[in-house]
Amino acid sequence: MVSRDFDRDKRLLTARQFSAVFDSPTGKVPGKHVLLLARENGLDHPRLGLVIGKKNVKLAVQRNRLKRLIRESFRHNQETLAGWDIVVIARKGLGELENPELHQQFGKLWKRLLRNRPRTESPADAPGVADGTHA
């Protein structure tokens, strides 16, 4: 069974990691008052970054509640999100949503992100494998 923790290795920590997702996202999912940007990370686990600014969510209490709920939703869905770096960007109005509505919305957003995942090549389709020219 995969660990459902939210350790340091499951977070985007540096500006370089955030920039990689912002500069070339392979997945983009808009939602009600939120935008998800994602990029494949080549790891066996997903990583999450949150952008919840004062301009869009005024009260610190609301920002902290949103961070808690988003992290919790991510934690429960991380098995299906393996291999992604995901940045959640809050927009105006996200702080006014109630907890059940937020849980429901993020459940749908994670599923939409998975549907938008680019198809990976099968080993037989990869260059150099079928023709035996790989090193």
Curated annotation (Swiss-Prot):
Sorted alphabetically, the Gene Ontology BP terms of this entry are: tRNA 3'-end processing; tRNA 5'-leader removal
Gene Ontology molecular-function annotations: 3'-tRNA processing endoribonuclease activity; ribonuclease P activity; tRNA binding
Q: What class of enzyme is it?
A: hydrolase
E.C. number: 3.1.26.5
Family membership noted in the UniProt record: Belongs to the RnpA family.
NCBIfam families associated with the record: rnpA (TIGR00188)
Q: Does tRNA processing appear among the keywords?
A: yes
Q: Which GO terms describe its cellular component?
A: ribonuclease P complex
Reaction(s) catalysed by this chain's protein: Endonucleolytic cleavage of RNA, removing 5'-extranucleotides from tRNA precursor
Quaternary context: Consists of a catalytic RNA component (M1 or rnpB) and a protein subunit.
Q: Which residues cross the membrane?
A: none
Gene behind this chain?
rnpA
The coiled-coil segments of this chain are none
- Write out the function statement from the record: RNaseP catalyzes the removal of the 5'-leader sequence from pre-tRNA to produce the mature 5'-terminus. It can also cleave other RNA substrates such as 4.5S RNA. The protein component plays an auxiliary but essential role in vivo by binding to the 5'-leader sequence and broadening the substrate specificity of the ribozyme.
Which named protein is this? Ribonuclease P protein component
What InterPro entries does the record tag this protein with?
A: Ribosomal_Su5_D2-typ_SF, Ribsml_uS5_D2-typ_fold_subgr, RNase_P, RNase_P_CS
- The domain of life for this entry's organism is Bacteria
Its keywords, alphabetically, are: Endonuclease, Hydrolase, Nuclease, RNA-binding, tRNA processing
